[in-house]
Regions:
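Short helix-to-coil transition segments within interhelical loops
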Residues: 115-145, 185
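Transmembrane alpha-helices
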Residues: 24, 133-164
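Non-cytoplasmic
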Residues: 81-82, 152-202, 208
């Protein structure tokens, strides 16, 4: 191991922790807010139980608008909001704000697409048996689409792992910040290669874990 990497090990562990912090907050926001938003988008679709075309079009437009923003631009545009929520515009907690804002509509659309795969006959059968709307959402839609939802969460985690690296450009901390400061500005190629290898390992862990979870859900 080169001397530069050995000297950076303490910072490297901190950077990994910051990356997990940003990713954890962003994914939590996506699940808690983006999940229900995706279900609502599906239910507002014409032909569904809460069908409301104007509301669906407005909500869908908002989701598409936020998703269309390049993350680096969204990161800068949300600096005032970040300062209000986090009290600062730098650091992993500050970077978690735009990550969460980007993750919510992204995951919502993935959830909507996953739920659309549920056979319409299953939903109609649940309605015919007198199931409430909440029961249909939880025991039919979510249950039937569970493997698709797990894979959607995988896509989200992998995508936003790269987004967390982008946050390093504006002082967001994490592995990306380490790569920028040492690998790019100081031309330490070994550090750059190490951070790339770490990101690849993290992506592979995400893919391995969630693919196993998806397989298990299909066996239930």
């Amino acid at each position: 191991m080169s001397e530069s990497i050995t000297a950076l090990l303490p910072e490297l562990w901190v950077a990994i922790g910051q990356t997990f912090l940003m990713l954890g907050i962003g994914l939590s926001a996506a699940i808690v807010l983006g999940g229900p938003l995706g279900v609502l988008l599906f239910l507002l679709t014409p032909g569904q139980s809460l069908a409301n075309k104007p509301a669906y079009l407005v909500l869908s437009w908002v989701v598409n608008t936020v998703r269309s923003f390049p993350f680096i631009i969204l990161l800068v545009a949300l600096v005032p909001l970040t300062r209000i929520i986090a009290g600062t515009s730098i650091g992993p907690l500050a970077a978690a704000v735009p990550l969460s804002v980007a993750a919510i509509p992204y995951f919502a659309r993935l959830v909507e697409q996953s739920i659309r795969e549920v056979p319409r006959g299953v939903i109609e059968a649940a309605h015919a048996m007198g199931a409430s709307e909440l029961q249909i959402v939880w025991r039919v839609l979510v249950l039937e689409a569970r493997s698709g939802l797990i894979l959607a969460l995988t896509v989200l985690a992998v995508s936003f792992l790269s987004y967390s690296a982008i946050a390093g450009v504006v002082g967001g901390g994490g592995i990306g910040d380490l790569a920028i400061r040492y690998g790019y500005y100081r031309f330490q190629t070994d550090v750059m290669l190490l951070t790339v290898a770490l990101l690849i390992v993290l992506v592979q862990i995400c893919l391995l874990y969630t693919s196993d979870a998806a397989d298990d859900s299909l066996r239930v």
